Swiss-Prot record:
KW Nucleus (keyword) present: no
Protein purpose: The production of the second messenger molecules diacylglycerol (DAG) and inositol 1,4,5-trisphosphate (IP3) is mediated by activated phosphatidylinositol-specific phospholipase C enzymes. In neutrophils, participates in a phospholipase C-activating N-formyl peptide-activated GPCR (G protein-coupled receptor) signaling pathway by promoting RASGRP4 activation by DAG, to promote neutrophil functional responses.
Cofactor note: Binds 1 Ca(2+) ion per subunit.
Binding site for Ca(2+): N328, E357, D359, E408
Location of the C2 domain: 666-791
An example Gene Ontology CC term for this record: cytoplasm
Protein known as: 1-phosphatidylinositol 4,5-bisphosphate phosphodiesterase beta-2
Biased composition (Basic and acidic residues): 874-883, 1150-1159
Length: 1181
């Protein structure tokens, strides 16, 4: 856009609109009809009507959402009003006199203003021209000066009965600070009392501007003005203004030949337009006040106006565009109990949406009219034909490009489906595309037609029955499938499908059946989760012939795989994904997803669990090239705000052309790229939030948030200013550093959001603008509401600077190559400072032949080949100075504090586990000993018969078992044997459980330790790479400094050799050229060396990580081997423990020991201590 010739002019108000027309305004609720005169102010800001008592009502044109005439306008329902308008008379022609104006803050909260004209067809002209004013791109994208002018127009229109401006209107217009309003009125010598009034003649535009300057002074603009005007002079000459425009307001990336800078004679036009002083205009001077209004003018719009018009190529295939899409369009609130309304289809289409959704269900008797509702919820119903009628009315009011109707068809009645098809044919008429275009047949490999080819057409997205004859519908839960089509429904004999096509469809059906069989193996919870994510979309029925015949270029098919889709190569097939499924595909196969969207279309919609109608962020799916990213238009949250803001561009057509890399099949695009994208120049964006104006109706502290939406590799940081120093919402100033987004990889996919918040995080206003639509320089940013409506008062004053991204390493070299003369002249000025650093300079300039002077003063050129040796030496020297970086070894990583601490904790856990196991083992043995003692005591009571004079003595457990003389020594009590077997079994189980616990705990420890080592290794390696990069940058800068010092040495030596000015200039140019080549060569060599070192470093780091991962398998194998060895010897250990513990109680099991009877000896049998065996078992475990 040229600075002096804005592309877009403000809307033109036709004379008859400003002159006015007589109407009758009626209200159905009150049954009142009032004669009014309807007008539009000459500047097109307000639609207003005046009653007979001179009372006036206003409607801001920016709030108008629709105008309707004839049968689409509201019709009185009150009998009283019907009698007033003689509606019962057949020759009344009432519909030719109607006019309805629809306005509201969003798409749900609407107000209808109804008028009836005295003449026929008057309402038609008013409806068309008023809507054209409301939808004009400059109505909501007007410059700051226009919004300030709207305030003046409204003040002058709201007059009291005496024809004067009430002062109280000023207080209502600027409610934030009444005292400041009074002071500003006083400064302009105007009345300031609450009950006073001002004569409109005393308040012209010049006085109004003075009032604004007093109410909202702009010290920040005064500072800018001071930095460019002549010292001690209160004005800026046209030369100074030209310099300011070319340096600050001009995009530095523009080519000076194709886009020449401003010239003083052109700038004089701006001074004539904005300078309030006539004397200054004659002298070509601009005052500070003129500077303020210049920065508020259309020449300094923050937007590139040409992007608001249709400026993109609209002849590409349909799948090469992002398409503004809606989900569950009929709902006005939540997904469970919200109201449904046909009006939502009008509002969504008027906002620029080109894809709407219709959830169709079978109507109930007796009418059996198909309905639209959200199935299995408490949402209300609307008739299908009402929705179709609304779409037919509003489809092409704001955009001529094709509309896609996305049917979610649950109507399993052939008769009702036929009725749906008939409604579409009759109401849409010629706009309904029923047959493919001749040049774009439905064949594999044939691309889709373009939006231009489909201009003014409506396309149906519905399941298509690919074969002739009806297909039986699938049963929904609790329903019964109906029979075949009735005879009244025609069936085509030839559907145009070849045998190859039928085979492909059969293959898809087989795959779908296999997937359904696999889904049958899922548990109930997984099936419920899948159904809740998809909502009712998975319950669609099969299309019958009538509806199927309407489907052509948008044929929904169940997604199978990217490979399958690529093999079939059918551009007319579209698949729908929930946000979760799309995110999964994007995460696992992002590049395949992008390639899929190059060939055919995809639709993404919110998951079924978003019962509050909230939205997901659409940016991630735009990054993958998904065309129809459907959102809930009734919820104006941040995702919807971004969608509304971006689709406002390209003429609000609902179609945005994707980037070339997302369209060309020979190019690969990875949305997760973090480095660079081939051939795409990254952008650096810097934004400084300077001040705000009229941000709130209350005196509060405010702050500003700045956020970037784009690729995952873009800078994702959200910046925020501090709170304004004082509670001042009229003109707060933030003196902070600029917010910099250093590397925006693909500017075409990025957008900037700037939001103003009140203290306490209350939303005040925001703006979302694509990066490619921004202009560099100082700009006033007019804010929008949450529903993207233009706000009259609030604005921000910002400074934007956009330039091509250049790494710091190449910054100096880029400047030198872009403007070598300017760069080296600047370096010459630094030579004096460097002279003391460089020390004594050599007498000879090069190592070859010295420069000499002839007797006549003519210079002699330096020896041949003097540049190359220096360049080579410097490059080698730079390469030698770069040391090869090292990475941490495996041993060093093992000694890291975090790893050692974790190992100690694991060792402690293992010791505790083994201690508990040993204690349990000991308890089992002691319990067995106690049970054995009890058995032997019982046996002793039956068999022992002590003598008369015998003395009672305490015996050990084994002594209590007395063997009778007739009883063999090798026979034992069977209960004792049973006790022994049970004890061995319990010990066996305890040992197995203990060994398994140890193995499981060791495996867990190995996993945790390896994960910890991997985490610390990655952190350390990231720090190593960062240090390496910082060191590399430092080395490069030092090398450049050395080369610069060397250049200065050569120039100093040259001046000593010859005094001829011409020769000096020539030799100086040679030295500078040589220096540039030398720097380029040295930087190239150093960069190659650094890249090699970085590759080696990354290879070592990768090898280290692989070693750590290999350790996990080794440790687990070792733990498993130990476990298997212990389990193998457990049985023998158990028997040995039992035998050793009770060896004297089971004499038959003692190895190589003679049988002995306790009866034969009076001595006690020896008993092993219990604790010693338990200790042995603990040490073994």
């Amino acid at each position: 856009m040229s600075l002096l010739n804005p592309v877009l002019l403000p809307p033109n108000v036709k004379a008859y609109l400003s002159q006015g027309e007589r109407f009758i305004k009626w209200d159905d609720e009150t049954s009142i009809a009032s004669p009014v005169i309807l007008r539009v102010d000459p500047k097109g800001y307000y639609l207003y009507w005046t009653y007979q008592n001179q009372e006036m009502e206003f409607l801001d044109v920016t709030s108008i959402r629709d105008t309707r005439f004839g049968k689409f306008a509201k019709i009185p329902k009150s009998q009283k009003l019907r009698e007033v308008f003689n509606m019962d008379f057949p020759d009344n022609h009432f519909l030719l006199k109607t006019l309805t104006v629809v306005s509201g803050p969003d798409m749900v909260d609407l107000t209808f203003y109804n008028f009836v004209s005295y003449k026929e067809n008057v309402g038609k002209d008013w409806a068309e021209d008023v809507l054209a004013l409301a939808k004009h791109p400059m109505t909501v994208n007007a410059p700051r000066s226009t919004f300030l002018d709207k305030i003046l127009v409204k003040l002058k229109m709201q007059l009291n009965p005496e024809g004067k401006i009430p002062v109280k209107n000023f207080f209502q217009m600027f409610p934030a600070d009444r005292k400041r309003v009074e002071a500003a009125l006083g400064a302009c010598h105007l009345a300031k009392g609450k009950n006073d009034a001002i004569n409109p003649e005393d308040f012209p535009e010049s006085v109004y501007k003075s009032f604004l300057m007093s109410l909202c002074p702009r010290p920040e603009i005064d500072e800018i003005f001071t930095s460019y005007h002549s010292k001690a002079k209160p004005y800026m000459t046209k030369e100074h203004l030209t310099k300011f425009i070319n340096q600050k307001q001009r995009d530095p990336r523009l080519n000076s030949l194709l886009f020449p800078p401003a010239r003083p004679e052109q700038v004089q036009v701006l001074i004539d337009k904005y300078e309030p002083s006539g004397i200054n205009v004659q002298r070509g001077q601009l005052s500070p006040e003129g500077m303020v209004w210049f920065l508020c003018g259309p020449e300094n719009s923050v937007l590139a106006h040409d992007t608001l018009l249709i400026h993109q190529d609209m002849t590409q295939p349909l799948n090469h565009y992002f398409i503004n899409s809606s989900h569950n369009t009929y709902l006005t609130a939540g997904q469970f109990s919200g109201l449904s309304s046909a009006e939502m289809y009008r509002q969504v289409l008027l906002s620029g949406c080109r894809c709407v959704e219709l959830d169709c269900w079978k109507g109930k008797p007796p009418d059996e009219e198909p309905i639209i509702t959200h199935g299995f919820t408490m949402t209300t119903d609307i008739l299908f034909k009402e929705a179709i009628e609304a779409i037919a009315e509003s489809a092409f009011k704001t955009s001529p490009y094709p509309v896609i109707l996305s049917f979610e068809n649950h109507v399993d009645s052939p008769r009702q489906q036929a009725k749906m098809a008939e409604y579409c044919r009759s109401m849409f008429g010629e706009t309904l595309l029923t047959d493919p275009l001749e040049n774009f047949p439905l064949k594999p490999g044939i691309p889709l037609p373009s939006p231009e080819d489909l201009r003014g057409k409506i396309l149906i997205k519905n399941k298509k029955n690919q074969f002739s004859g009806p297909a039986s519908p699938s049963k929904k839960p609790g329903g019964v499938a109906e029979g075949s089509l009735p005879s009244s429904v025609p069936v085509e004999e030839d559907t145009g499908w070849t045998a190859e096509d039928r085979t492909e469809v059969e293959e898809e059906e087989v795959v779908e059946e296999e997937e359904e069989e696999e889904s049958g193996n899922l548990d109930e919870e997984e099936i419920k989760k899948m159904q809740s994510d998809e909502g009712t979309a998975g319950l669609e029925v099969t299309a019958y012939e009538e509806m199927s015949s309407l489907v052509n270029y948008i044929q929904p098919t169940k997604f199978i795989s990217f490979e399958f889709s690529a093999q079939k190569n059918r551009s007319y097939v579209v698949s729908s994904f929930t946000e979760l499924k799309a995110y999964e595909l994007l995460s696992k196969a992002s590049m395949q997803f992008v390639d899929y969207n190059k060939r055919q279309m995809s639709r993404v919609y919110p998951k079924g669990t978003r019962m509050d109608s909230s939205n997901y962020m659409p940016q991630m799916f735009w990054n993958a090239g998904c065309q129809m990213v459907a959102l809930n238009f009734q919820t104006m949250d941040l995702p919807m705000q971004q969608n509304m803001a971006l689709f406002e561009f390209n003429g609000q057509s609902g179609y945005l052309l994707k980037h070339e890399f997302m369209r060309r099949l020979d190019k690969q695009f990875n949305p997760f790229s973090v480095d660079r994208i081939d051939v795409v120049v990254a952008t650096t964006l810097s934004i400084t939030i300077i001040s705000g104006q009229f941000l709130s109706e209350r005196s509060v502290r405010t702050y500003v948030e700045v956020e970037l939406f784009g690729l995952p590799g873009d800078p994702k940081r959200r910046y925020r200013t501090k709170l304004s120093p004082t509670a001042n919402s009229i003109n707060p100033v933030w003196k902070e550093e600029p917010f910099i987004f250093e590397k925006i990889l693909m500017p075409e996919l990025a957008s900037l959001r700037i939001a103003v918040m009140e203290e306490g995080s209350k939303f005040l206003g925001h703006r979302i603008i694509p990066i490619n639509a921004l202009h560099s320089g100082y700009h006033h940013l007019c804010l929008r509401s949450e529903s993207n409506m233009a706000l009259t008062m609030p604005a921000l004053f910002v400074f934007l600077e956009m330039k091509d991204y250049i790494p710091d390493t190449w910054a100096d070299l880029t400047v030198a190559l872009a403007n070598p003369i300017k760069y080296f002249n600047a370096q010459d000025k630094k030579s004096v400072k460097l002279k003391g650093v460089t020390g004594s300079l050599p007498e000879k300039l090069f190592s070859g032949t010295p420069v000499a002077s002839q007797s006549n003063g003519a210079p002699v050129s330096a020896g041949n080949g003097s540049t190359a040796p220096g360049t080579k030496a410097t490059g080698e020297e730079a390469t030698k100075e770069v040391t090869e970086p090292q990475t941490a070894s495996l041993e060093e990583l093992r000694e890291l504090k975090g790893v050692v601490k974790l190992q100690r904790r694991h060792e402690k856990e293992l010791r505790e586990l083994e201690r508990r196991g040993a204690r349990r083992w000991e308890e089992l043995l002691q319990r067995g000993a106690a049970q054995l003692a009890e058995l032997q005591t019982q046996a002793a009571g039956c068999k022992l018969r002590p003598g008369k004079g015998s003395r009672k003595k305490r015996t050990l457990p084994c002594e209590e078992t007395v063997v009778a003389p007739s009883e063999p020594h090798d026979r034992a009590d069977p209960r004792v044997q049973e006790l022994k077997d049970r004890l061995e079994q319990e010990l066996q189980q305890q040992g197995e459980e203990q060994y398994r616990s140890v193995l499981k705990r060791k495996e867990q420890h190995v996993t945790e330790q390896i994960a910890k080592m991997m985490e610390l290794a990655r952190e350390k390696q990231a720090a190593e790479l960062k240090t390496f990069k910082e060191t590399s940058e430092t080395d490069t800068k030092e090398m450049k400094k050395k080369l610069e010092a060397k250049r200065l040495e050569r120039i100093q030596a040259m001046t000593k050799v010859t005094t001829d000015k011409v020769a000096q200039e020539r030799l100086k140019r040679e030295i500078n050229n040589s220096h540039i080549q030398e720097v380029v060569q040295a930087v190239k060599q150093m960069t190659e060396t650094l890249e090699r070192h970085q590759e080696k470093l990354e290879e070592r780091q990768t090898a280290c990580l692989e070693q750590i991962q290999a350790m996990e398998k080794q440790f687990q194998e070792k733990a498993l081997a130990e476990y298997e060895a212990k389990m193998k010897g457990l049985e023998a250990e158990v028997k040995e423990s039992v035998r050793a513990y009770f060896k004297d109680c089971f004499p038959t099991e003692a190895e190589d020991k003679p049988e002995r009877s306790c009866e034969a000896s009076e001595e006690s049998c020896p008993q092993e201590p219990l604790v010693s065996k338990a200790d042995t078992q603990e040490s073994r475990l």
